[in-house]
């Protein structure tokens, strides 16, 4: 089974790379029925307009804001080995990035519109925010490669953890612990951290979708996390790839059939909709998704919680202060960090030796 691995500019104006294939020709093929099975691979850049910072953009990305936490390296925030010993940073970030704080953007609505038009084959999402589903994309057409917030369990005894207690933990930023007698293990949401296996069935689903796709749409991803980063490379060379992103990533742009739309994701997807004659319908679909999300938030009592939530930056500062008090002079914490860094270095050296 595949596992999640981490590998260690913003464009001022939207630009389209000049290849043989163009946006016009792609849209024409969709309109004439030549393209009927679009597979999408989406990353954090799809959700930036929803208020969720991506990870690697200098100055504004999540990793650029983590300095107060003094992590051994940015990805440690989402590494299972680090989480097992030091879960405080993760829950500080979770408090500021939980789905109750977010609403679908135009990009999420665009995916829902593709399905409505009958041309969406599947969505591989690296996001854990669930905004594709909130926008109306059918659950059976989405694979959350990095999991989601739908469930939670103890990492020690694997027992399920009450949803109401998890909501309280996220709201306060406190680490939740198992409620089973004599366990006291750390509780983790159903997200996939670095060092954990991807969802069961990923390999077979990837093979199935790439073998039947007639277009790959890559939106808002750095393609720096394997095995997701390999999806565009594994696509048959005759199938066009459309990149919607701030910058070029992977090897997209090297094939004559590639189309690279560089700039703001929402702006470009609106432009694609305009080329297809779907611009008014896209705005209508987006408006409907916002109404549904607001109603869902009210029904779950999330709207009040969202108003109470501090900013991401405030969550980070508070967590840093708490960690300094709790673990600043802990010899055990120092040994844990040294051991974790040793494991990380061993992984790097092993990869280099392959």
Curated annotation (Swiss-Prot):
Residues noted as binding Zn(2+) in the record, renumbered to the chain: 154, 157, 178, 183
UniProt cross-references to Pfam families, sorted A to Z: SIR2
CC per GO annotation: nucleus
Subcellular location, record wording: Nucleus
Coiled coil stretches, renumbered: none
Membership in a protein family: Belongs to the sirtuin family. Class I subfamily.
Name of the protein described by the UniProt record: NAD-dependent protein deacetylase hst2-2
Species the sequence originates in: Emericella nidulans (strain FGSC A4 / ATCC 38163 / CBS 112.46 / NRRL 194 / M139) (Aspergillus nidulans)
């Amino acid at each position: 089974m595949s596992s999640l691995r981490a590998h260690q500019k913003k464009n001022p104006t939207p630009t389209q790379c000049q290849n043989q294939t163009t946006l016009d020709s792609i849209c024409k093929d969709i309109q004439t029925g030549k393209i009927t099975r679009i597979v999408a691979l989406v990353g954090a850049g799809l959700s930036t307009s929803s208020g969720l910072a991506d990870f690697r953009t200098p100055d504004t990305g999540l990793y650029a804001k983590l300095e107060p936490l003094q992590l051994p390296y940015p990805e440690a925030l989402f590494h299972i080995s680090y989480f097992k010993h030091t879960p405080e940073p993760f829950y500080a970030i979770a408090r500021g990035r939980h789905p109750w704080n977010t609403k679908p953007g135009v990009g999420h609505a665009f995916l829902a519109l593709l399905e409505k038009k009958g041309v969406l084959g599947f969505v591989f999402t690296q996001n854990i925010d669930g905004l594709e589903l909130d926008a109306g994309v059918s659950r059976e057409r989405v694979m959350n490669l990095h999991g989601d917030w739908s469930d939670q369990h103890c990492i020690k005894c694997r027992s399920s953890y009450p949803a109401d207690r998890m909501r309280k933990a996220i709201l306060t930023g406190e680490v939740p612990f198992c409620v089973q007698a004599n366990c006291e293990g750390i509780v983790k949401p159903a997200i996939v951290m670095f060092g954990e296996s991807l969802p069961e069935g990923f390999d077979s689903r990837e093979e199935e979708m790439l073998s039947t796709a007639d277009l790959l749409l890559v939106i808002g991803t750095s393609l720096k996390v394997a095995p997701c980063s390999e999806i565009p490379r594994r696509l048959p060379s005759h199938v066009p790839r459309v990149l919607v992103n701030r910058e070029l990533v992977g090897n997209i742009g090297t094939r004559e059939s590639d189309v690279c739309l560089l700039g703001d994701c929402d702006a470009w997807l609106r432009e694609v909709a305009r080329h297809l004659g779907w611009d008014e319908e896209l705005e209508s679909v987006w408006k409907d998704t916002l109404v549904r999300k607001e109603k869902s938030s009210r029904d779950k009592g999330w709207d009040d919680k969202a108003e109470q939530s501090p900013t991401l930056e405030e969550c980070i500062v508070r967590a840093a202060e708490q960690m300094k008090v709790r673990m600043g002079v802990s010899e055990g914490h120092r040994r844990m960090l040294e051991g974790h860094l040793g494991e990380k270095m061993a992984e790097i050296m092993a990869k280099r030796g392959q």
